[in-house]
């Protein structure tokens, strides 16, 4: 049944949902990659669609910005609509020189400065990691399409405008591949409610050099990341 944030019914969503932050990117994915896509959510403008990709039923819905927002949608999709797998497809910022604009990053683990997972985990540190099979299938899908990817840790921040730029030095030292705002929360929700999750991100800007993509590019391109996610779902069915 419908929730305060999703006006859909059981069965409207597929068991796998791709989740970009931007609802307009969700619409772009539905219109570009899915067949027979129909809108299944529009509450607060957070657009959601269900269609098929190469005959496989798949949904896509935005999750907004930040861990609180994405946690609401992820939790409701899992507990109220029977979703089993969530793949975040979003943008991230790079802090290391060897990570370049438009590189695709597969988030094997997600560090964070958020306290959300500590609240879930009785004030202990929770290892927010992706599901191994989802990681493996994403890597295999990228190889099959000859798309280079980076696999490793990303960092989910609570503040987009950081008051502590020295933290970027620490991230670089520890080999963080990308900085974003949601993956650690989605991994925590998936673990709490028995689902599987993965974040695949495209580097949209470089925090060190200032190089960046435009808002339009972020909304309508980054197709490599989307194709990896879609093809990985098919591999997971085999």
UniProtKB/Swiss-Prot annotation:
GO cellular component: cytosol
Residues making up the signal peptide according to the UniProt record: none
Transmembrane segments: none
Binding-site list for phosphate: 21, 25, 44, 88-91
Catalytic activity: a purine D-ribonucleoside + phosphate = a purine nucleobase + alpha-D-ribose 1-phosphate; a purine 2'-deoxy-D-ribonucleoside + phosphate = a purine nucleobase + 2-deoxy-alpha-D-ribose 1-phosphate
InterPro entries, per the entry: DeoD-type, Nucleoside_phosphorylase_CS, Nucleoside_phosphorylase_d, Nucleoside_phosphorylase_sf
Gene3D superfamilies per record: Nucleoside phosphorylase domain
EC numbers on record: 2.4.2.1
Keyword Transferase in annotation: yes
Subunit structure: Homohexamer; trimer of homodimers.
Protein name: Purine nucleoside phosphorylase DeoD-type
Taxonomic path: Bacteria, Pseudomonadati, Pseudomonadota, Gammaproteobacteria, Enterobacterales
């Amino acid at each position: 049944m419908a929730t305060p944030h999703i006006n859909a019914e059981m069965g409207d969503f597929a068991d796998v949902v791709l989740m970009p932050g931007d609802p307009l990117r969700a619409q772009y994915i539905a219109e570009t990659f899915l067949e027979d896509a129909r809108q299944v959510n529009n509450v607060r403008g957070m657009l959601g669609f269900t269609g098929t990709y190469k005959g496989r039923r798949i949904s896509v819905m935005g999750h907004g910005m930040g861990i609180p927002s994405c946690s609401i949608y992820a939790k409701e999709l899992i507990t109220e609509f029977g979703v089993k797998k969530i793949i975040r497809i979003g943008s991230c910022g790079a802090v290391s020189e060897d990570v370049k604009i438009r590189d695709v990053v597969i988030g094997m683990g997600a560090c964070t400065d958020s306290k959300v997972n500590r609240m879930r985990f009785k004030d202990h540190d929770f290892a927010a990691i992706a599901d191994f099979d989802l990681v493996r299938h994403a890597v295999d899908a990228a190889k099959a399409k000859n798309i280079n990817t980076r696999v490793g840790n990303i960092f989910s921040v609570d503040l987009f405008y950081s008051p502590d730029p020295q933290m970027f030095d620490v991230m670089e030292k520890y080999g963080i591949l990308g900085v974003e705002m949601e993956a650690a929360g989605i991994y925590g929700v998936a673990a709490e409610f028995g689902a599987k999750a993965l974040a695949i991100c495209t580097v949209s800007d470089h925090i060190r050099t200032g190089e960046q993509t435009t808002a339009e590019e972020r909304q309508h391109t980054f197709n490599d990341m989307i194709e990896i996610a879609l093809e990985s779902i098919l591999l997971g069915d085999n």
